[in-house]
Swiss-Prot record:
GO terms for biological process: arginine biosynthetic process via ornithine; L-arginine biosynthetic process. It is found in: Cytoplasm. GO terms for molecular function: argininosuccinate lyase activity. Belongs to the lyase 1 family. Argininosuccinate lyase subfamily. Its EC number is 4.3.2.1. SUPFAM superfamilies: L-aspartase-like. It comes from the Bacteria. Pathway: Amino-acid biosynthesis; L-arginine biosynthesis; L-arginine from L-ornithine and carbamoyl phosphate: step 3/3. It catalyses: 2-(N(omega)-L-arginino)succinate = fumarate + L-arginine. This is Argininosuccinate lyase.
Amino acid sequence: MALWGGRFTQQADQQFKYFNDSLRFDYRLALQDIDGSIGWAKAIHSVGIINQAELVELIAALKQLRAEVAPNLAIVLQEDAEDIHSWVELQLIKKVGDLGKKLHTGRSRNDQVAVDMKLWCKAQVLSLQESIRALQEKLVETAEANQLSVMPGYTHLQRAQPITFAHWCMAYYEMLERDYSRLTDAYKRMNTCPLGSGALAGTAYAIDRDLLAQDLGFETATRNSLDSVSDRDHVLELLAAASISMMHLSRFAEDLIIFNSGESHFVELSDRVTSGSSLMPQKKNPDACELVRGKTGRVFGALSGLLATLKGLPLAYNKDMQEDKEGIFDAIETWQACVNISALVLEDIKVDTERTKEAAQQGYANATELADYLVAKGIPFREAHHIVGEAVVYAISQKKALEELNLDKFKQFHSVINDDVYPILSLDSCLTKRCAKGGVNLERVAEAIAAAKQNLNQ
């Protein structure tokens, strides 16, 4: 039974009914819809629409319904209804009879779905932040165990300068910290309650909306009824946060795919997060990482899709806005799964420290140190840069590392070069010199790890 049949003389075509109905996906809002209905029952009691006995009966029935639904939201789908709001009201009427028909007084599905979505988004923020913290803890744990694991750092996928695996881990810790704070910021803006805004012009009853907001766990009520039922910024912000974070996770996955390859062999991923080939017995494929990378596009698509949906909508509510749900439900489920699987990938990861060190010693990753050495000897950096470039070209032609060139050959590039150049070209020196805050110096990395642990323990 629809909630709006009085105006119509014909029943909806079954094809349209399926096209229009949303219960098959918005059933996920069952708990939020029930919670909002409990809050609304208290609100209409406060202005005399229902008496105390009716309030008690309504709340008891709604709480009973919540207890029935909470263990498995999908039980909602066992019965037919247009949407989750209709389903909850119909179940309530079954429990309390005509009293259930009073609950919707002064309320529209427009403000009802708006509050449901905000309640749902708020709950997702808290759950996602918990998962992000768990992944950060794994990154810090892995960093702490690999502070001496020297490896090449890359630009343009070319060896650039030596770093440590710990420094690499902490780079992703920082990205996730921004993801965490982005959710915190979004939560502040979604922490306003639209219930009581009616269809668009506000409710006709003198309800204390700020009290209603606080009862539902919001900081305050929204300020404009027209905006309240039209607003989906909270969904967009959550999708934007998800998209940025998924981009970070995809880069994390891509790095590990490269590090795990036979050509790099910097890390070995556990059997628990890899799979084999149906044809090639030797294969051990990084499927967990590849799926994180692959699923990123789904989340990006949800954001761009909703932006396109909302961009041309006149105020206030339009049925187009029903399209906010499937994308956000899938995107958040995907994001949560990718955060969790990324933490699992780190649990048993093995770093081949001999191989990473060997790679760090190749590719002339110490060339910048030679340029800095020349600068310390009074050579302008741009000139030093050119000199070192010539030295690298020569070393490549001789199939030698820079530190393998003899002093006479170094002096052919510039006379200021002396024996003291050789210690400068060592991996230890390369790391030690990067001692400014945020650098790869071992003490700075240890400080970053300590600060991260303190932050995670707060």
